Amino acid sequence: MNEKTIILANPRGFCAGVDRAISIVERALEEFGAPIYVRHEVVHNKFVVDNLREKGAVFIEDLAEVPPGATLVYSAHGVSKAVRQEAAERGFRVFDATCPLVTKVHKEVARLDAQDCEIIMIGHKGHVEVEGTMGQLAPGKMLLVETVGDVAKLEVRNPDKLAYVSQTTLSVDETKDIIAALNARFPNIRNPHKEDICYATTNRQTAVKELAEQCDIVIVVGSPNSSNSNRLREVAASRGIDAYMVDNAGYLQRAWFEGKNKVGVTAGASAPEVLVREVLATIRGWGHETVREGEGAEESIVFVLPKELRREGETKPDLCKR
């Protein structure tokens, strides 16, 4: 009889950008007291957001909800230039929790625009990161593509002055297909200096592919509005096995595991390890008692906090190396 085993993906859970964003809100609360206003959910995870709300964070979408002189934090997903300008005009104390890898894309957009390139954004319409990146330029200046099919519909000013950037949390495989379609239609399109999909997204997708090869079912811990968590579930499902995404252990269904000997568990980049442990406890209680860690890429990158929120010893260069 096959042993009932749970295999944990590595890496999984929090990435450096999420760690930094949560720390910025927590440090701001410690330094300046509640309330601290946060534009949009600082990361897309219900547990994290609820926990910060209990500590005094107030999550808003419209800066009109923020009183004069208040402290405001931008979410990890980044904001448009219009939001930055409005915050400056209103005189808020601002801390920017935008992931540095998203900021890198913003800088790439500015550089390309200065060179008079028309820019195509590969991403999901309505996602806050996409809105922030496209908002680095005036409305209508960037073109959005979500699928390979969208590439054929593009109308560009000059195919020889064209470039693309990507949302950082996309499926690596799907994005490759879109990039291939762009290069086929526009042979002179400029590629980013460095891949836009972040290291954490890539590493977690690679790990879940390996997990899917070993397991009968994969559980992804993540909130429904988390782009990278959704992509993990899709990647696992594309391997032909059952794959489910759950916000926490309460969403697990015992019937999913009937007849399944090997269960894979991973977590999106915004999902804390405490939720993974609760999921493990529930599945173990249903008979999958053996747990082992999978092998995968080691991650050592740490992004430093804004200087106003740093503590002694947090300015060393080795704290932000890969």
UniProtKB/Swiss-Prot annotation:
The active site is at residue 129. [4Fe-4S] cluster binds at residues 15, 99, 198. It is an enzyme of class 1 (oxidoreductase). One of its GO terms (molecular function) is 4 iron, 4 sulfur cluster binding. Binds 1 [4Fe-4S] cluster per subunit. Its cofactor is [4Fe-4S] cluster. GO terms for biological process: dimethylallyl diphosphate biosynthetic process; isopentenyl diphosphate biosynthetic process, methylerythritol 4-phosphate pathway; terpenoid biosynthetic process. GO terms for cellular component: cytosol. Pathway: Isoprenoid biosynthesis; dimethylallyl diphosphate biosynthesis; dimethylallyl diphosphate from (2E)-4-hydroxy-3-methylbutenyl diphosphate: step 1/1; Isoprenoid biosynthesis; isopentenyl diphosphate biosynthesis via DXP pathway; isopentenyl diphosphate from 1-deoxy-D-xylulose 5-phosphate: step 6/6. Its EC number is 1.17.7.4. Pfam families: LYTB (PF02401). Isopentenyl diphosphate binds at residues 44, 77, 127, 226-228, 270. The keyword Oxidoreductase applies. (2E)-4-hydroxy-3-methylbut-2-enyl diphosphate binds at residues 44, 77, 127, 168, 226-228, 270. Keywords: 4Fe-4S, Iron, Iron-sulfur, Isoprene biosynthesis, Metal-binding, Oxidoreductase. Dimethylallyl diphosphate binds at residues 44, 77, 127, 226-228, 270. InterPro entries: LytB/IspH. It catalyses: isopentenyl diphosphate + 2 oxidized [2Fe-2S]-[ferredoxin] + H2O = (2E)-4-hydroxy-3-methylbut-2-enyl diphosphate + 2 reduced [2Fe-2S]-[ferredoxin] + 2 H(+); dimethylallyl diphosphate + 2 oxidized [2Fe-2S]-[ferredoxin] + H2O = (2E)-4-hydroxy-3-methylbut-2-enyl diphosphate + 2 reduced [2Fe-2S]-[ferredoxin] + 2 H(+). Belongs to the IspH family. Catalyzes the conversion of 1-hydroxy-2-methyl-2-(E)-butenyl 4-diphosphate (HMBPP) into a mixture of isopentenyl diphosphate (IPP) and dimethylallyl diphosphate (DMAPP). Acts in the terminal step of the DOXP/MEP pathway for isoprenoid precursor biosynthesis. PANTHER family: 4-HYDROXY-3-METHYLBUT-2-ENYL DIPHOSPHATE REDUCTASE. This is 4-hydroxy-3-methylbut-2-enyl diphosphate reductase. The gene is ispH.
